[in-house]
Amino acid sequence: MAHKKGASSSRNGRDSAAQRLGVKRFGGQVVKAGEILVRQRGTKFHPGVNVGRGGDDTLFAKAAGAVQFGIKRGRKTINIVEPATQDA
Protein backbone atom coordinates (compact mmCIF):
# COMPACT_ATOMS: atom_id res chain seq x y z
CA MET A 1 0.00 0.00 0.00
CA ALA A 2 1.20 3.44 -0.86
CA HIS A 3 1.98 5.82 1.95
CA LYS A 4 1.85 8.82 -0.37
CA LYS A 5 -1.68 9.30 -1.60
CA GLY A 6 -0.94 11.30 -4.71
CA ALA A 7 -1.82 14.70 -6.13
CA SER A 8 -4.59 16.87 -4.70
CA SER A 9 -5.19 14.77 -1.62
CA SER A 10 -4.52 15.61 1.97
CA ARG A 11 -4.18 13.80 5.27
CA ASN A 12 -5.42 16.76 7.30
CA GLY A 13 -8.91 18.16 7.52
CA ARG A 14 -10.21 16.50 10.66
CA ASP A 15 -11.50 18.41 13.66
CA SER A 16 -13.66 17.45 16.60
CA ALA A 17 -16.73 19.30 17.79
CA ALA A 18 -16.25 21.40 20.92
CA GLN A 19 -17.51 19.79 24.13
CA ARG A 20 -19.37 22.88 25.40
CA LEU A 21 -17.81 22.70 28.85
CA GLY A 22 -17.84 25.45 31.45
CA VAL A 23 -20.01 27.28 33.95
CA LYS A 24 -23.66 27.39 32.83
CA ARG A 25 -25.21 29.28 35.78
CA PHE A 26 -23.32 32.07 37.53
CA GLY A 27 -23.26 33.36 41.11
CA GLY A 28 -26.52 34.90 42.27
CA GLN A 29 -28.60 33.36 39.49
CA VAL A 30 -31.81 31.66 40.63
CA VAL A 31 -32.13 28.06 39.44
CA LYS A 32 -34.65 25.24 39.63
CA ALA A 33 -33.91 21.69 40.76
CA GLY A 34 -32.19 19.67 38.05
CA GLU A 35 -30.59 22.58 36.22
CA ILE A 36 -27.00 22.06 35.12
CA LEU A 37 -24.59 24.42 36.86
CA VAL A 38 -21.19 23.36 35.46
CA ARG A 39 -20.08 20.95 32.73
CA GLN A 40 -16.51 19.87 33.43
CA ARG A 41 -13.89 17.19 33.01
CA GLY A 42 -12.63 16.22 36.44
CA THR A 43 -13.68 18.13 39.55
CA LYS A 44 -12.53 21.69 38.94
CA PHE A 45 -15.58 22.64 41.02
CA HIS A 46 -16.81 20.43 43.86
CA PRO A 47 -20.46 20.01 44.85
CA GLY A 48 -21.62 21.80 47.98
CA VAL A 49 -25.01 22.20 49.66
CA ASN A 50 -27.94 21.12 47.44
CA VAL A 51 -25.62 20.32 44.52
CA GLY A 52 -25.13 16.87 42.98
CA ARG A 53 -22.43 15.43 40.75
CA GLY A 54 -23.19 13.34 37.67
CA GLY A 55 -21.15 10.47 36.28
CA ASP A 56 -19.27 12.81 33.93
CA ASP A 57 -18.54 15.26 36.82
CA THR A 58 -21.35 17.61 35.77
CA LEU A 59 -22.70 19.60 38.71
CA PHE A 60 -26.46 20.10 38.96
CA ALA A 61 -28.92 21.72 41.36
CA LYS A 62 -30.75 19.36 43.72
CA ALA A 63 -33.10 22.09 44.94
CA ALA A 64 -34.36 25.47 43.81
CA GLY A 65 -32.43 28.51 45.01
CA ALA A 66 -29.62 30.90 44.17
CA VAL A 67 -26.17 29.81 43.00
CA GLN A 68 -23.30 30.63 45.35
CA PHE A 69 -19.63 30.02 44.59
CA GLY A 70 -17.18 29.58 47.44
CA ILE A 71 -14.00 27.93 48.66
CA LYS A 72 -13.91 25.17 51.27
CA ARG A 73 -10.64 23.53 52.32
CA GLY A 74 -8.87 25.03 49.32
CA ARG A 75 -11.41 23.63 46.85
CA LYS A 76 -13.79 25.66 44.72
CA THR A 77 -17.33 24.68 45.64
CA ILE A 78 -20.82 25.53 44.43
CA ASN A 79 -23.81 25.77 46.78
CA ILE A 80 -27.50 26.41 46.25
CA VAL A 81 -28.88 28.76 48.90
CA GLU A 82 -32.28 30.31 49.54
CA PRO A 83 -32.66 33.31 47.22
CA ALA A 84 -32.65 36.64 49.03
CA THR A 85 -36.21 37.96 49.20
CA GLN A 86 -36.70 41.66 48.58
CA ASP A 87 -39.30 43.39 50.78
CA ALA A 88 -40.65 46.29 48.76
Swiss-Prot record:
<dbReference type="InterPro" id="IPR018261">
    <property type="entry name" value="Ribosomal_bL27_CS"/>
</dbReference>
<dbReference type="GO" id="GO:0003735">
    <property type="term" value="F:structural constituent of ribosome"/>
</dbReference>
<keyword id="KW-0689">Ribosomal protein</keyword>
<comment type="similarity">
    <text>Belongs to the bacterial ribosomal protein bL27 family.</text>
</comment>
<dbReference type="InterPro" id="IPR001684">
    <property type="entry name" value="Ribosomal_bL27"/>
</dbReference>
<protein>
    <recommendedName>
        <fullName>Large ribosomal subunit protein bL27</fullName>
    </recommendedName>
</protein>
<feature type="region of interest" description="Disordered">
    <location>
        <begin position="1"/>
        <end position="21"/>
    </location>
</feature>
<dbReference type="Pfam" id="PF01016">
    <property type="entry name" value="Ribosomal_L27"/>
</dbReference>
<dbReference type="GO" id="GO:0006412">
    <property type="term" value="P:translation"/>
</dbReference>
<dbReference type="GO" id="GO:0022625">
    <property type="term" value="C:cytosolic large ribosomal subunit"/>
</dbReference>
<keyword id="KW-0687">Ribonucleoprotein</keyword>
